[in-house]
Amino acid sequence: MSPLQLNGKSRGTSPGNAEPLPIFDALCRSLPVGTADEQFWWKLTGRHLARMMLEAGYPEHRQVECLLFHRFKVVPTFGPQPQSAEPWYRSRVAASAGDGAPISYSWRFGTADRKPYIRNYIEPLGPLTGTAADPNNDVATRAFLQDLTTTLPNLDLSLFWTFEPHLVSRFSDKADREKYAGPSVLTGVELSPDSDAIEIKMYLYPRIPEQISQLLSTIIPKAMREAYGDDVCLDSLNLVKDFLSNHPDGRQLSPRGTTGIDCCKVQDSRVKFYVATNNTSFDHIATVMTIGGRRPLSTEVLDKLRELWYELNGLPSDFPTSEQVPTDQGQEGPSGHHGVGFYYDIQPRLALPDVKAFINVRKHAKSDLAAAETVIGFLERHGQGHHNPRAYLNVLRDIVPAEELETRVGAQAFYSVAVKKEELDITAYFIPQVYRRFASVQVELNGQRRSRFE
């Protein structure tokens, strides 16, 4: 019998982290085997999740709870295991930074009053995924959400179901269905260490390009009025719309199309509107983060933000803040510099939206390890090392061998940066490398690879 089918006796190895995972291993010995596909995804992503929670210091009972949820609610949605380095269906998870796998991860490093915590991003796959019967992969997602309504008592999908018909296109014409085929909905699964709840986020993406330009002006306001009532306060949304329309820096922002929604009580939920810019000067980034000065940030915070941006890009401290990040003219491919992403966090009860920046590791760092060391060193220097940010390196080494982390980019997708109480709140987004490292993953899961540290 193949090791992939033998639960508890061949659980595979990690590429570079030989430390045991006692809770994961105990569950592997006790849980039902399931299908060969489920075993593949459980052995790979279950181990990753177990490593993340162990390194982040999750209580043992919470580790068990989250692993069981992952095994029985999430893993069965991943569909067939890979048969080659080319995905049978290319998921939109992690967008341009992903390799087509239906899952990615994030690690929030934590702030003075909040511990590190983990989130997974998934796209459920089903028998109709990628076929003419389900060109936008709606069926599997709807089935997954229906299943969650019987499992998660805190789940409230009312805002999502209100927004969904405004943002997800339906096509009656065959030519249009084929033209606009592709995923339109993703799911975020948030696993907080200090809660017994599992929180769900939904991300909607219109397939018709013309819709993207209408999001702020028409589509989102209409959906918000339907959700909250005709008298809903749209001050936060209108502020963002005015900045993008009238401010010189705002006019450089392009909507990306993604709209994020918290699946909790409507009055507590947020609507996240994503944009991007090709301008890499720090002055521009700071202006976008402050919404043209309407959401002021202290000099200390801006200095920290500039320090992090310069270090990730390898810039000297006296590099002019008005200048764009230099691009190696002879350099081709994904490592060239192409700007920064942001989202504006819109809530009817708040007049000012929160802002978060997204820095693409493949475009703004020499290697995955260099980026991680830069972020960790920054946190330690600025008194944010109380949650042991270096534990994140153990997570990366459980996914990718050390020499690949030192010489390549690809394991990490983004770092996001927000401001919380004068601290930079940083989150790392990374991917399991299911297809990009297809051959190595097959060997590792069959337990034939020695540790890279041996």
Curated annotation (Swiss-Prot):
Disulfide bonds: none
MF term (GO), any: prenyltransferase activity
EC number assigned by the record: 2.5.1.-
Keywords: Transferase
Pathways involved: Secondary metabolite biosynthesis
InterPro entries to which the protein is assigned, alphabetical: Aro_prenylTrfase (IPR033964), Aro_prenylTrfase_DMATS (IPR017795), DMATS-type_fun (IPR012148)
Biological process according to GO: alkaloid metabolic process
Coiled-coil region(s): none
PANTHER family: INDOLE PRENYLTRANSFERASE TDIB-RELATED, PRENYLTRANSFERASE ASQH1-RELATED
Function as written in the Swiss-Prot or TrEMBL entry: Prenyltransferase; part of the gene cluster that mediates the biosynthesis of neosartoricin, a prenylated anthracenone that exhibits T-cell antiproliferative activity, suggestive of a physiological role as an immunosuppressive agent. The non-reducing polyketide synthase nscA probably synthesizes and cyclizes the decaketide backbone. The hydrolase nscB then mediates the product release through hydrolysis followed by spontaneous decarboxylation. The prenyltransferase nscD catalyzes the addition of the dimethylallyl group to the aromatic C5.
Family statement: Belongs to the tryptophan dimethylallyltransferase family.
Protein name as it appears in the record: Prenyltransferase nscD
Organism name: Neosartorya fischeri (strain ATCC 1020 / DSM 3700 / CBS 544.65 / FGSC A1164 / JCM 1740 / NRRL 181 / WB 181) (Aspergillus fischerianus)
Gene designation: nscD
